[in-house]
Amino acid sequence: MFIDTAKIFVKSGKGGDGSISFRREKYIAFGGPDGGDGGKGGNVVLVVDPNMTTLLDFTYKRKYKAEPGGNGAGSKCFGKNGKDLHIKVPMGTIVKDAETDKIMADLSKPEDSYVVAKGGRGGKGNCRFTTPTRQAPDFAEPGMPEEERWIKLELKLLADVGLIGFPNVGKSTLLSVVSKARPKIANYHFTTLKPNLGVVSIEGVSNFVIADIPGIIEGASEGVGLGLDFLRHVERTRVLIHVIDISSVEGRDPYDDFLKINEELKRYNVKLYGRPQIIAANKSDMLFDEEKFEEFKTKVEKHGYNKVFKISAATKQGVDDLMKEAARLLSTIPVTDLEISEEDRFIEEEKRFTYSIRKEDNTYIVEGSFVDRLLNAVNVNDPDDLRYFHKVLKNKGVMEELMEMGIEDGDVVRLNDFEFDFLL
């Protein structure tokens, strides 16, 4: 079964907590602090598997969690790092943040990988906080929290050439003739319900991959038929072969078909509409009025499409010349990565030292992940801990920001449940 979209939940490992420990050995009166650091939590990493061709595996398992880091211990023992969790995805997978729909990564090469959830850093043990004036710190850092998010995976097939056109115009037949692909072929609409890939080999020319893109009809860019499901697969192609039924056996006008398909491309993606396009007037073996082809060709050329081939996939007439032109055109177009605009790109927030300050009456409230982490690390009833607490607030710019906001002596500063009076 071909599945090209999936939504999964990923969660990295939490960092291990630092240890609060003091050396206790016979004949050593003042052993000092010896609490070790916590281990780093495991990452969740998406890695490309060139042998995968579908996202089917993610319909059976949707939640993935990496291993947490181990806690530190006495004797300066460091916690064990959590193992990274590697999730295999097909080549050509786009990774999106499910909440914002922003693009996090484009995994389009065999060696590509992406850390989709970073493991938390291990907390420092109390031996890390010794100074000449603080020789017995009784606090340690907790491990950094894990990252968790829902992500969307979208598979965009990696093909050099895309076959587009209305249903039943002969795209699958053409694919089967020029490659070893064996798509389902029948005389009714939507015979092809998934994109099919084939490799075209031309003597003296490097091979290229061609894809039969099904389901593009009028209104496809707005979700009619199967269009939206498969239009994404055209995005990576460098050349489009627009297959037209020149015989009009189904009663449609070839030129009208040409205009409608191009209008759908334009509505879906303007850059896709501007991609090099070769017109393949198929089913010429059923065309009994040669003037009809010439009339169609003249109209199409007025739109700037000068490569119009009269072919018959059934009899292979003109097919070789069509493929040679596709190969020639490909040789002039460099392979480029999928363009991701700044508007669509996901930007990872720095969560370690984030905080915000707001004022309510004469109380200044400091909130954020930085505050939670700091309060978990210190004992506010211990004078040494309080001095360290004040130093961190000063170093991270909290005190300076409070003064810029106009704080005065005696005003209350609140961090979660802890309050203190501000003194200049």
Swiss-Prot record:
Keywords attached to this entry: Cytoplasm, GTP-binding, Hydrolase, Magnesium, Metal-binding, Nucleotide-binding
Q: Which cofactor does it need?
A: Mg(2+)
Q: Where is the OBG-type G domain?
A: 159-331
Database matches in CDD domains = Obg (cd01898)
- From what superkingdom does this record's organism come? Bacteria
Q: What is its EC number?
A: 3.6.5.-
Q: Where is the OCT domain?
A: 345-424
Could you confirm whether the keyword Lipid biosynthesis appears in this record?
A: no
| Primary subcellular site in the record, as a coarse category | cytoplasm
What's this chain's function?
Answer: An essential GTPase which binds GTP, GDP and possibly (p)ppGpp with moderate affinity, with high nucleotide exchange rates and a fairly low GTP hydrolysis rate. Plays a role in control of the cell cycle, stress response, ribosome biogenesis and in those bacteria that undergo differentiation, in morphogenesis control.
What HAMAP family does the annotation carry? GTPase_Obg (MF_01454)
* Listed name of the protein: GTPase Obg
Q: Which gene encodes it?
A: obg
